[in-house]
């Protein structure tokens, strides 16, 4: 075999080295107290004592962005998909009461294109900055034959810490708690197999009447909102009994994850700030209205269960619109009742 046998098999080692050099400046943006060592070691290190947590419990989460990646590839826009990946992970662990500490990413591709992969990792770094987490490691795997040359997949792993006494596991949610919602930025990163089917014959350049002047592709690739900085102060003051990250499965699947089986969520649909893209999906996809709440976030990306006496303090700490969308009630049938 020749000296460049690996390259002939489709793996460009030099391109891999270039990716590492390109992403160093982006990784540097995510530095935070506790990080030990630098990029390129066999393992990322973090000094937990720097968090100041007295009884630390580590909470971890992993996720990807599903077939939203296919739209990023279709529209050749790769600079925000990394933020989606970070958001999906850190929003999950914040729902358990954790302060996210560090993040690792995994990218697999058919062909190592340094400029494109730099955009992806720059998006990851931006998500880390918004979350206050350090990007302490990652892997870029070039896998010709497994993926097409233009294809790639992206996954992430987040680790956070919580005071043992402040873990949010749903046990404190009680009948009478008020449900408060924070707005989503769009579809986020779930339901895209259906989204792609609905808009399969569209170029993405269309400005649909429902989308208020925005191009379809820009709305579909709007990055997932990160809720860490909004939620952490509420957790620190122990103002919330439960948190639900509204992801795949919409309201119906995710809201019950924050309370016990004997309770239910009663939601006033008129209080939900439904985004234009969901109205467009329902219309052009001919999707039953009730099914929309089983698939999408419908405009609410994070939900809190809060004691009535804490509602005003929560609203005071959150420098944004807060939607009072329902109550926790005794279960008498379905776990989520939308009226």
Swiss-Prot record:
Catalytic activities: 2-formamido-N(1)-(5-O-phospho-beta-D-ribosyl)acetamidine + ATP = 5-amino-1-(5-phospho-beta-D-ribosyl)imidazole + ADP + phosphate + H(+)
Keyword hit for Ribonucleoprotein: no
GO CC terms: cytosol
Entry annotated with the keyword ATP-binding: yes
A biological-process GO annotation: adenine biosynthetic process
Functional pathway: Purine metabolism; IMP biosynthesis via de novo pathway; 5-amino-1-(5-phospho-D-ribosyl)imidazole from N(2)-formyl-N(1)-(5-phospho-D-ribosyl)glycinamide: step 2/2
Keywords: ATP-binding, Cytoplasm, Ligase, Nucleotide-binding, Purine biosynthesis
Full protein name: Phosphoribosylformylglycinamidine cyclo-ligase
Organism: Streptococcus thermophilus (strain ATCC BAA-250 / LMG 18311)
Lineage: Bacteria, Bacillati, Bacillota, Bacilli, Lactobacillales
Encoding gene per record: purM
């Amino acid at each position: 075999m020749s000296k460049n046998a690996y390259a002939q098999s489709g793996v460009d080692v030099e391109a891999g080295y270039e990716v590492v050099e390109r992403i160093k400046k982006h990784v540097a943006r995510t530095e935070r107290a506790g990080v030990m060592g630098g990029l390129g070691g066999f393992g990322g290190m973090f000094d937990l004592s720097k968090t100041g947590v007295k009884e630390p419990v580590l909470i971890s989460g992993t996720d990807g962005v599903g077939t939203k990646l296919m739209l990023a590839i279709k529209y050749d826009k790769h600079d925000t998909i990394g933020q989606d990946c970070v958001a999906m992970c850190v929003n999950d662990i914040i729902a358990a009461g954790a302060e996210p500490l560090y993040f690792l990413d995994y990218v697999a591709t058919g062909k190592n294109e340094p400029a494109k992969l730099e955009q992806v990792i720059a998006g990851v770094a931006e998500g880390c900055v918004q979350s206050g987490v350090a990007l302490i490691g990652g892997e870029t795997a070039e896998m010709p034959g497994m993926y097409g040359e233009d294809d790639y997949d992206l996954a992430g792993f987040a680790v956070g810490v919580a005071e043992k006494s402040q873990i949010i596991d749903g046990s404190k949610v009680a009948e009478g708690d008020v449900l408060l919602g924070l707005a989503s930025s769009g579809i986020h990163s779930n339901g895209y197999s259906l989204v792609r089917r609905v808009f399969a014959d569209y170029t993405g350049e269309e400005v649909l009447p429902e989308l208020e002047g925005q191009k379809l592709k820009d709305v579909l690739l709007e990055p997932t909102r990160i809720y860490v900085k909004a939620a952490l102060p509420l957790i620190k003051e122990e103002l919330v009994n439960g948190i639900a990250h509204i992801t795949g499965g919409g309201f119906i699947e995710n809201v019950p994850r924050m309370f016990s089986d004997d309770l239910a969520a009663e939601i006033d649909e008129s209080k939900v700030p439904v985004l234009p893209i969901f109205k467009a999906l329902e219309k052009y996809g001919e999707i039953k209205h009730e099914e929309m709440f089983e698939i999408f976030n419908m405009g609410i990306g994070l939900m809190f269960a809060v004691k009535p006496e804490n509602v005003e303090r929560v609203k005071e700490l959150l420098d944004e619109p807060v939607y009072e969308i329902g109550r926790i009630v005794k279960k008498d049938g379905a776990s989520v009742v939308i009226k």
